[in-house]
Amino acid sequence: MLPSKVVHRKAVRTVPLLLAALIFAGCTGQAPHTPPANVQGAADGTSDYYLQQVQQSADDNKVDWQLLAIRALLNEGKLPQAGDALTQLPADLNNIQRQERLLLLARLNVARQNLSGATDPLKQIDISALSQQQQVRYYQLQIAVGQGQPSLDVVRAWVALEPLQTSPADKQKNIDETWQALLQIPQQQINTLTINANENVLQGWLDLLGVYKNNVTAPDMLKSAIQDWQTRYPYNPAAKMLPTSLTQAQNLHPASMGKIALLLPLSGQAQVFANAIQKGFNDAKNGVLAQSTVAPSPAGPVQVPAATPGDAAVAVSPSATTSDKAVAEQPAPAINVTTAAPSASTQIQVYDTSSQPVEQLLTQAQNDGATLAIGPLLKSDVDKMLNSQTALNVLALNEPESVQNRPNICYFALSPEDEARDAAHHMWEQGKRAPLLLVPRTSLGDRVNKAFAAEWQKLGGATVLQQQFGSTAELKQGINSGAGIRLSGTPVNVQPQQQAGVTIAGLTIPAPPTDAQPGATSSNGRVDSVYIVATQDEMILIKPMIAMRISSRDNVGLYASSRSYQAGAGPDYRLELEGLQFSDAPLLSGANPALMQQAAKAFNNDYSLVRLYAMGVDAWTLANHFNEMRNQPGFQIKGDTGMLSANQDCIINRKLVWSQYHQGQIVPGT
């Protein structure tokens, strides 16, 4: 037996070792534990954190951490790194990992604005294999892919997303966006939709759309109809939480029409244009518009004088064109608001913008009791009006170079740019993807080029080519030499708007690199369509010069602005332009032959003034529905200058009537 002193000393030496072991064991037990990677859940960490886990994890968890890292890289806008990481994923993924990879691939393509590239991976996804969190991302991507292209698929995605959202704010946002998506679908498409028997929520939404369109001009009737709809569809999300804009529409009151100020130039070069607008406005206001009592029938050719050039600052197509054969108007949308009723009680006071500054006239009009101003007409005066910060509601009769979104201002213009934008939509809807612009070598040509190309880019199109032509003498020289016009050109230089990151359905998409081409459809250098801005004398030379260089097998569509549309040219002219489509206002396309005859007589068949007369008629209707145009999305007017609608800046867009030369006749455009 050892002495007690020895035992005591040994015990003293052992205690620190035991304490150290216990402390070490305690520290080991309290060390942070890394949770397992869950690709079906949220990814709240940074890409650096997930990449570190990739380096430290075993092989069986490495792929999951890689997928989370890719999602974080996308969230941070690091698209090149995310793309590289996607290519480094192994081929032998399990089903959960495969579904996540497809989601990430679609997300990457959406972020790169390659929407077509996002469609294929989304089609391969098995929705039933996704977690609820993944389903949210799936429907967000479906909506993002359909941005700018209204369709029932986008609406279906919004409908499917709604039950997965828990926040009341998110649900309201969903309902508002579902409603906006519905409003953007063309009525022709609505009429042909096929709804599955189990799509009760979607059917309810479509019925609500019908309720809105049938009662849009009567707030009290709209309110009653919505209440009836809520009774019929008590479980529809919108029955419990109406779209915000629909709630506002129920409480919207027409603009005050007690006294209207007309701001027009009553002297100088623009006086003739102002007189035409004023006459159209007064005729509509006083109820002296001729109306056709029978269906429009083809009218005989009308000989008209040469065009009277207009002031370049005035928003009017610079040529005088004529109506030949009456053309049936295109089908109207369901929101069928036509020319406003006349009003004897409305006072009209005209202010001369050529004699006093616009700022002073606006103040004077307000002091005189006006509640709405129509005008000014010249671009320079519109800029001055904006600088005046007037409190009056204003329907400007031109569009400034830099549009400002003001709650009391709308912009209504007739211009070559307006026609060019409509042409871009018409040609896109006809399946054309590689247009060439054939325009005069003037500032007019430059304006048309920029307007068309900018609109084409918004639609998802690739680079637009342009070719300019000179005088009629130059064209004659070209046709005499047999040179023809080759369908080639130089790209229109449209400076893309600086894009910022956007959030769609809760999915944040970082801004793409500045040198990226957003979702463009490549033309591969082959032109499939030509938009021509030319006078009658120029067009009769240009059309055969194009025919010299192409064959009928090339299937190149030819389109033109109203600049070349004249009736007095006779059957030879119409035969020479066989197949050419052209646009014009409904009034000049046979929508109302009686009013057309009245206007043509008043202006001695000067059709540039007839268009401005129609603009005055539509200005009266727009004044009566100013609040609706300014505040109700989807509100449309069947006007004499076109089907009128407004964008978010209250720029009045015109959908024109397209006609076509066919066997010496003028028929509706195909």
From Swiss-Prot:
Gene Ontology terms: cellular component: periplasmic side of cell outer membrane
Gene3D superfamilies for the chain: 1.25.40.650, 3.40.50.2300, Tetratricopeptide repeat domain
Cited PROSITE patterns: PROKAR_LIPOPROTEIN
Covalent lipid adducts (S-diacylglycerol cysteine), residues: C27
Chief place where the protein resides: membrane
Localisation per UniProt entry: Cell outer membrane
Any GO MF annotation of the entry: enzyme regulator activity
Lipidation (N-palmitoyl cysteine): C27
Topology class, membrane: Lipid-anchor
One Pfam match: LppC
Residue stretches in coiled coil: none
Keyword set, alphabetical order: Cell outer membrane, Cell shape, Lipoprotein, Membrane, Palmitate, Peptidoglycan synthesis, Signal
GO biological processes: peptidoglycan biosynthetic process; regulation of cell shape
Residues annotated as signal peptide: 1-26
Subunit structure of this chain's protein: Interacts with PBP1a.
Protein family according to the UniProt entry: Belongs to the LpoA family.
PANTHER family: PENICILLIN-BINDING PROTEIN ACTIVATOR LPOA
Function: Regulator of peptidoglycan synthesis that is essential for the function of penicillin-binding protein 1A (PBP1a).
Name of the protein in question: Penicillin-binding protein activator LpoA
